Amino acid sequence: MCIRDSSILATGIMASASFADTFTLRVGSGHPSKPTAYVGNMEKVLVPNIKKRVAAETNHKVRIIEAYAGKIAKVHETLEAVEKGLLDIGSYCVCFETAKLLPWNFDYFVPFTTTNLETNWAVKHKILKQFPALTKMLEDKYNQKFIAMQGFDDYGIGTVKQWQKASELKGVKVIAAGPNLPWVSLFGSIPVTSTLPTMYNDLATGVAKGVIIFPSAHAGGFKFYEQAPYWKVIGFGAMAQTITTINLDTLKKLPPEVAKIIMEEAKNYEKAAVKDGQQRYQKGLTDLVKLGKKKGINDAVTYLPLDQQKIWAETIKDWPNSRAKDITKDYGMDGAALMNAYMDEMEKTGHKFPVRYKIGG
């Protein structure tokens, strides 16, 4: 809820009036700041830059209440919190909103994509321009405007025990956020739905023996490596899955010059976040090797061979088309065109999918 306090500074005999307003904005995310690049840069880049520029370039002031780590809305509540105005600006993973934002998850539905977050982010931005219905649905259905996109570094699997062939994961309970669970369930693993804040306990209590996650989280503040020290670089890909939105009612109440600053700084924020996310990926892998050695594990980080990657992709090759059909059926959007456009644009970057998924037709 955007709150405004106004004072009128009159010049002459009411001939003109200048309004100096103080706006209060609630900004937040369900994830914590330190271990996640998209929230960390929200706190360190977006918020301070908005404050500084509004103070320096306008007659207004902005007071920002920051609410990370679910203080106002948990990971699966942020979209609704922005919709209702509980948060004026929110950042969240569309992976937790498959019932409402299934089409936004299209890169999840084309696994073994690029492992570079900055590349995937750039390609996904191209797709957003080609398919404006994606951003429009946020405005038409959920009272919020898309202002930025970030994401997570290359997904792999952390496990309690070492393994070599993909077939060894059959029958093993593996945790994931939700829409990416078929990556392993279709291969024979037992899927367990969880979120970043609860995954550690799920591993610690034996609910699962593995987790689909990204290195920066596995080695970083979430410390999943303590329970699952063996990391396998699978090559599922980096995913531009997190977005930032602003409540439309809030946006309408803001002076144009303030709104302009927010939109501009949102662009700076997303660039900083994806760059940081990619850097965290490299650091995460390095840290996992070091942490493994401290435990006496010399093979803490290993790589899935390309032949195994192709076997994996072949096993799940019909799933992307199934998801495309769901997008078309339930959202009135051409899911096949959307996902084929994504693969086309990704291949223009030089990426080669182990299996070129057949979608549509």
Question: In which residue ranges do the predicted regions lie?
Answer:
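Cleavable N-terminal signal peptides
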Residues: S7-I8, S18
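Sec/Tat signal peptide C-region and signal peptidase I cleavage site
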Residues: I13-A20
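N-terminal secretory/targeting leader peptides
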Residues: D21-W121, M137-D140, Q144-G361
